[in-house]
Amino acid sequence: MNILITGVGGPAGRALVSQLATTSHNVVGVDMQEVALADIDSFELVPAANDPDMINQLASLVDHYDVDLLIPTVADELPMVAKASQLGQLSNAQVVISPLEAVEKCFDKLLTMRALREAGVSVPPFGVPSDFTSAYDVFEQLGVAIITKPRVARGGRGFAIHTSPEKFQLESYDDSYIIQAFAPGEEFAPMVYVGDQPGNETVSIVAKTQEEFCETAAPIVRSVDTANALDVALLAVKACHALKLKGPIDLDVRRMADGHPVVLEVNARFGANSSLAPELLAEVLKSAA
């Protein structure tokens, strides 16, 4: 197959390229910056996700390389790619992405949390700044530690943890941010593949063992036997179904102080750790064959 991967310079894109290196597939990598990768057959520059011409250029590359399978990995481009796929703008390429409505819910962290809560999926207590009357009200409602993060942002950009109402300046945040109770327990990064048939899910669990909260600090990750974190695996699958997601999904889950897991974020794409779960890409390739 001819496979086009977006964002090949990022962690998610590189993880996929490394897995495809030992296959016979022809891999076309695209990125908004020049990337030197030995394991791809072709490379093309594309505009940033917010460029109105991005989809047109992507569609042109799909035609030029006769792409069979398009795998987007850049969070910012997912809504546009999902819409283009829905409208048939990407020729006959199979696009590895969830339905547009599901992608849009995952793109906005507040919409994600609301949809999961309404579906009975465990999430930490949360709100937006206008839901609270003061910093003290935030801590009274959410607990002894809270986090703030932009509703729309990649990775840990804009993330902050707060432990003191005296030092927390609620007035400096508008409703483009979400405020969540901090889950202090072990952190997991479940990866799920949801197939077209009911009950066709593949789940892999990765544990993050480094407590770092700056965007440049890479956590230490390790694979976990699903049987040893069955509640996390079941929660991840339940979240994917609640959001009506399909294909590969990357989640962030933590345990609350009492030990029960909660969903923090859901990314409707392959994540940076997919090389630890090659069975997910195998499912994608099998489905596209």
Descriptions of predicted regions:
Residues L37-D41, D53-N56, E104-K109, G156-F159, ...:
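Short, charged, surface-exposed secondary-structure boundary motifs
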Residues P52, L78-P79, G155, G271, ...:
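Short glycine-rich, flexible loops that bind phosphorylated cofactors or substrates
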Residues A102-G185, D196-P198, L230:
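Active-site nucleotide/adenylate-binding loops and adjacent lid/helix of ATP-dependent enzymes
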Residues H162, D174-D175, Q180-K244, R255, ...:
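ATP-dependent carboxylate/phosphate-activation module, predominantly the ATP-grasp catalytic core
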Residues K246-D258:
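A short glycine-rich, hydrophobically flanked beta-strand micro-motif that places a catalytic Asp/Glu
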